[in-house]
Amino acid sequence: MDYERQQHAPIYEALERFRKKRVVPFDVPGHKRGRGNPELAQLLGEKCVGLDVNSMKPLDNLCHPVSVIREAEELAADAFGAAHAFLMVGGTTSAVQSMILSVCKAGDKIILPRNVHKSAINALVLCGAIPVYVNPEVNAQLGISLGMEVSQVEKAMDENPDAVAVLVNNPTYYGICSDLRTIVKKAHARGMKVLADEAHGTHLYFGRNLPVSGMAAGADMAAVSMHKSGGSLTQSSLLLLNKSMNAEKVRQIINLTQTTSASY
């Protein structure tokens, strides 16, 4: 990680430069940086609403970033050890769905745990992929589902050699992690992609003596919820890619469903 470069916040710095120019707004959003909705400005503060602006050349565009947003994504990729990172504003729901839509088409099989998040199920509805469920065991004392065992995943792969991907919760809602490294190794040996739902695993990238993160384990893609445990505002998330994925194709998939009016 380039620690010196990580000291920069390119999007925020661009927003501050723009705010100081005191440009009169004749575009969206309708609150006109607080002037059109003083109640909102009083609630959130003038500085906050003053930074809620429309996409424009000095501030880049999330759908096709070429300057400050692109630099921010490069910084995120560097920090998380990924080949590429996408800033997501539709929560990790949009990141999970983009992962699945990027590797699955109608009729394709994907192996996933039965306690997968509903966003993954909705993605299967959208693309027509076929789920192959693995039923994690349940800890009767705690009353919670555990992670997928390697033997369970391997059995599903042997019975469905035509599956195109395996999705792993890393960790589950209750903090349970599977042996992700081994699952990645066995899936890749069969030509299958590995997708990591890390909605509750942001800390795995930065803490010591913690389970392995998706990128470190060699997963092809990982959906990381920055707002859940990373300290950012609600709905902010990251979609991480390893070198095995085509970033331009994934960008196109993201743009199919992500808003064109992203909030800064």
Task: Cite the ranges covered by each PLM segment.
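Generic preference for hydrophobic/aromatic residues in regular secondary structure cores
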Residues: 15, 25-30, 85-86
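A short, flexible N-terminal coil/short beta segment enriched in small residues
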Residues: 24-31, 50, 56, 99-110
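Conserved N-terminal alpha-helix of the aminotransferase class I/II PLP-enzyme fold
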Residues: 48-94
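Conserved oxyanion/phosphate-binding beta-strand-loop segments in alpha/beta enzyme cores
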Residues: 27-47
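Conserved PLP-enzyme active-site core in the AAT-like
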Residues: 3-5, 11-16, 20, 40-43, ...
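Residue-level detector of solvent-exposed, low-hydrophobicity positions
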Residues: 19, 25, 31-35, 70, ...
